[in-house]
């Protein structure tokens, strides 16, 4: 029980309605369900599940080693704890686009994005990527569109072609992807304002901007992206990077000093954690569950 009010069809309707507004949607990545709850509490528009983050969390590099089961199971666990729509990175489609779309739709996801790299893919902000043909990607998109049952389930086409074939060829690909049924385009690894402006000028669909750190793209304020005409901005790896840096620093401090007294102020308190997991609400099941005070646990 997660005390969630909205069922998946309503989340998809919400996502569709948000896209039709004139406001850009701000969408951080969640690497676990608890992070998704925090994203909703703070007031963001949706939750994103990154394929790279899923791979990293399993101890793998982002080179296509995760399976449909790996990503769909984690995505389901994330999406079921929030009233927000969830967008999932499905990499290159996990061999069967039909099975992949059916799985993610059944698991309550609102949108997925599919990329045009070869199966042994890599992070979109690395060099020497290899692409499948435009025709092959078009067929994948068509298979995705045909497989979905809910008209509000969104197919997002990601193109990694800019750094391989140039921005003009990437735009040509994206136009073909739109014609194939993609409602949103994700032009990966754009460099600067000129790139973002050019893509917006040439494409008439909804556009997604990727503001990942340590990559090829300039990091814009969301208001700048909104002015450039973009509809969604994702922060795919941000929460994992924040968490892992803090965990590493804390573990090193404990190892060096033999105690955690120096880093208590960097930790989430017991009281705050219990607020985030709705501990008190579980008294609706049994009044003995939350029969204590968190005073002094700040």
Predicted regions and their residues:
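Conserved alpha/beta catalytic core and glycan-binding cleft of carbohydrate-active enzymes
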Residues: 235-298
